[in-house]
Amino acid sequence: MRKKLALFLTVVLTVVMMANVAIPARASEGSGDDPYKLIMVEEPKPSSGSRKAAGEEAAAAAAAEQTAEAAGDTSDPYKGGGDNADPYKGTGGDNADPYKGTGGDNADPYKGTGGNAAAAAPAAAVAEVEKYVPEPGADAKYTVTVTPDNWVKIENEGGKTLGLSQTSGVKIIEEEGLAFKDLNQNGSLDVYEDWRKPVEERAQDLADQMKGEEKALMLAHGGWDGPFTTEPLAADDASAVYLRAGGRGGVTRAISNGGGAHAKWTNALQEVAESCLYGIPAMISIDPSNISGLIESVSLASTMDPELAAEIGKETAKQYRAAGVTALLGPQVDISSPIMSRAGGTYGEDPQLTLDIATAYVNAMQSTYDENGEDLGWGPESVYCFTKHYGGAGSTEGGRDDHTYGGRYTVFPGENLEAHLITYFDGVFNLPGKTKSSGIMTEYAINVDKDGKQFGGEWAGAYNEFMYSLLDEVGYDSLKITDWGVFGGLGDKTGGLWGAEELSTAERLALGWQRGVNVLGGFGGYGEVGACADGYKELASQIGEEEANAILSKAAYNYFVVMMNLGMFEQPYNDSAYADSIIFSQDANAFGQETQDKSVVMIKNDGVLTGEAKTEKPKVYVPYVYSTGFSASWMMGVSEGTPSWAPGLDLNVLGQYFDVVTDTVGAATGEAGADGNPKYTKEDITRATAEEIADCDYVLVGMTGAYSASYNSHLQAAFGAPRDLTGIEEFYYPPSLQYAEYTADTARDPSISGNTVDGVKENRSYKGRTAPADPNYGHLEALQYANEIAGDIPVIAAVSMERGMVWTEVEPLCDVIFVSYNAHKTDSIARMILGQAEPNGLLVFQQPASMEAIDAQVDDVPRDMECYKDAAGNTYDFAFGMNWSGVIDDARTQKYSAAPLTKVQSHDFGDKLKTAATE
């Protein structure tokens, strides 16, 4: 298929060049069988010592001469980072960021093949355009500069700064001495091109000019399939083909290539976007990525500091915009149950904390600020947020991943759905700043009440009319994007197709638009974009052309308002040297380390650490830990994985602070793996001896918190070959928050939720089933060995977590326990041991007294568990933490220990969110 397509492109381009004409947009017929590309990688950590910013020589000059409109603190343009900057980076397990997969250079792991969607040809392959640099006339009130990145900066006197490609074909129109971009290349100044006019008028003008099918194509958000490059895009580059075919949005998974390099790549995308489809700029979105080491999600929540959240949001937005990113697919504000598989991406289990952190973060992300910190509203340092997952995705039954069939339902046995919506209606829809409201991303699952009745019928979030009606009820009017895969491409058992399994792709698109969605998350990329037009045609056939066009006009209008507010129609280009200078600065590294320090939670300290600064370099024993590699995930299905031995903490980082004693890993002696090489076994280790450890000051054990996810035994991967399920009984494994195996004798039976097939409702209960030992059980064994061999040497456990766990296996073996959410904060923990930093964080999840306490917990009700009490009598409850003075008791603990919120304050929904009105 690729060879045929390449040959076709060559022929098309040759004809175009010879004829010196443009080909009108057209999608070719084809199967859309561009294969998946998926290689999971970790994003590298920026380091002032080991990594140099690209374009370093130009960085100082770039920082001094920023874009004229970029209002912000230029004396300290960016903060964040550190040698251990990436909080998702760690030894595996919960440390890896589950939502970051990069295929090839930047493939989208959520993207499907598009079923019967037509593969896009190079829809408007254009003959070479002569370079164009405007020449201001005698009465011009603007200046023109060709930037080092080869785009043209046009600065209007008292007006907007424009960015223009030299080769897009777009030229300048001069009116009253001011410059405007002739984006549709018609030689006249259209309303949407006139930056003096109100955004609402401009957006409506452009929406009115476009045909229904053009709007459908533009609302695709399935790019970018082309290879990462810092050069102009080749004519047959998949991302260029997508843009010329009419697509305008997509998620980047290439930010790890560096800020400056990423800025060059996004400039290349925007150059193609400017050349076609009315010159509409591309929306380049990103999942939360921590590229400067700034904390987020549960790590940020553990500070319980909304002011810090605002500062991080402001700095993160500067960084993203400098690299060419305009929208964040986040934050994730699901109110997490104790066993939620995606808990690590949330702000924890409490509605008040989630409300405060999310509101502060989104408000700061979306605004641009002047040098005095005054909110200017939308501007060149603003990033639009799609807050997710509206609404209620934190209480899937069993905590199961809602990407999967097993996570098809969120359950609300405590009649508490409204609490899960507070952050939306009282927070991000009513921001205190000038941008007023964020966008949303819909959830995958179907919400059901205590009796198993669905809120809005058997429809996933993207199709759920009831959940959309709540938005209409309060007058919500911003962008709504779906989560990835809801229109197909990931199989019928994955990706939120629920309720639409029997519909064609075109029918799904039509239904989604009719129910309320605007932007098609993850859909419409290379090989799929033609299907968007098919979806519009289907919608028009169902409800008539006039109404179909009106629905898409409103969606397009919302999109244009966002992009015009961000200034993208005027200036979509970025200064690559400036991007490098603010992302990899020393200030960035220092602030990143500061935020990580503030997030670490100390839950036990038997008088071992006092905060007194150490004058000599201590010696520590750091054992290796064993993991089986087993996983059960929606992407890869059930995988036995590859067993591994690794140090529990980064020895290179620890070596900067301590003299390190550790174990020795021998040759692997297990059975051969798929690659023919032997696998590691538990016996392939030589532990440090008592004599080697005797003169150590501390034993420091790095561990990944215990968690085994609940999943269906017939789980299939969204990617890869189907499993052979012959002879495998279908049932649900229980979740577990302990290292040892667990039999769920006290679990709910029957389940609340279940799909009805042939008139019979399935029972998803896992009562009596056994969760196997945690894949990281070897981490507990390392602690057990350390405790046995340590003698009088203090044992310190550094545990990386994404939720709670049962501490009966761990706490009695430790003198000190540090909790780092999302990933090990190795630098921070080392600095605390040395007395260079003080613990500040607080638990954002209750820590259960037992697995039975978890089984008794009501899925949708926060903070209702019996909590673990340690040997010192401390209860590991929500908002518990210690510093050098003992148990923390401050304004944070007093505020967030209050009873959990249950009601939206800005609107009265009555009782409609307690129980469902329909089956």
Q: What do these predicted regions represent?
A:
Residues T10-N20:
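Bacterial N-terminal signal peptides
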